[in-house]
């Protein structure tokens, strides 16, 4: 355990895009902030498809969000492939082709870049440290250590300990299964809809030398078939060597209300901050993280 102080202005649980962005803007606003994450490195294990719009595409999708170039800083080392086209594949199988500017990320490198931005602003990180529970102003870790803060932010996804203990709404989380596969693939991202992934969708996102391929389903619509059955059928359409197997979930219940309870607030996937059309959450988490960080910094002042 590193030698680190125990009392902070703010503690962020979870160091992904939402958490690191929140911490960055709290620190830029003058707050002392600690980020606690159970992973090391942050960003691993991979749990998503890694696709984000470019900043230009985000300006088109979210015209009212200011200063996107300051917020969404993606270094070249974090970009696996640049995308120019999207194929939407309906049940008929005939793709609809659209222009789309996107980036397929190297997720660990992307999260490391966000950590560097937060640390440069003054945030500190405690990794490989799992939160047991949160009570009032105190965060209790599984190793027995305790940390206190005036504000505690839950940014640890749909299993965030603050969300689970204080927000008790029904959650619709779509389970997903995916692989990383080496090989040659088209340059367009593919989204498949219909019986291939009932209640969800399947994807193929090309990367440098391979692809991220997977799907998510609603189990209530799966007609007795398992997630693995659907995933195996879809993944078998592509030819290549599987180099990684992953799983996760997409929070599709919509934004949680309220986002704040007392000294606690939620951001990112923990708050249901995802695109309602497909559950994508990286850029939306960062937009929400900036707002949360700036509001918390103002409150602390």
Show the residue positions of the predicted features:
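Predominantly flavin-linked oxidoreductase catalytic cores and closely associated redox partners
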Residues: 15, 29, 41, 113, ...
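Helix-loop-beta segment of a Rossmann-like dinucleotide-binding subdomain
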Residues: 87-106, 138, 207-219
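N-terminal Rossmann-fold NAD(P) dinucleotide-binding loop
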Residues: 19-20
């Amino acid at each position: 355990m590193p030698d680190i102080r125990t009392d902070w202005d703010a503690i962020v649980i979870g160091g992904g895009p939402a958490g690191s962005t929140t911490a960055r803007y709290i620190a830029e606003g003058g707050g002392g902030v600690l980020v606690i994450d159970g992973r090391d490195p942050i960003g691993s294990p991979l749990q998503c498809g890694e696709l984000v719009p470019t900043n230009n595409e985000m300006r088109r999708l979210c015209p009212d969000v200011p200063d996107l170039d300051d917020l969404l800083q993606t270094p070249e080392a974090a970009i696996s492939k640049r995308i120019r086209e999207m194929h939407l594949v309906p049940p008929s199988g005939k793709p609809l082709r659209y222009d789309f500017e996107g980036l397929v990320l190297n997720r660990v490198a992307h999260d490391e870049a966000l950590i560097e931005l937060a640390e440069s602003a003054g945030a500190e990180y405690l990794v490989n440290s799992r939160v047991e529970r949160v009570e009032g102003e105190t965060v209790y870790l599984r190793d027995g250590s305790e940390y206190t803060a005036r504000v505690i932010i839950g940014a640890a996804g749909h299993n965030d300990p603050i969300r689970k203990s204080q927000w008790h709404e029904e959650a619709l989380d779509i389970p997903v299964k995916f692989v990383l596969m080496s090989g040659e693939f088209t340059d367009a991202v593919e989204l498949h809809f219909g019986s291939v992934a009932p209640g969800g969708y399947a994807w193929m996102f090309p990367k440098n030398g391979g692809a991220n391929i997977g799907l998510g389903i609603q189990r209530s619509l799966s007609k007795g078939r398992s997630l693995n059955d659907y995933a195996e059928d879809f993944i078998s359409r592509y030819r290549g060597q599987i180099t990684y197997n992953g799983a996760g979930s997409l929070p599709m219940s919509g934004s949680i209300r309220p986002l704040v309870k007392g000294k606690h607030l939620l951001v990112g996937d923990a708050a249901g901050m995802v695109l309602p059309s497909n559950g994508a959450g990286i850029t939306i988490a960062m937009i929400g993280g900036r707002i949360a960080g700036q509001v918390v910094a103002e409150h602390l002042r």
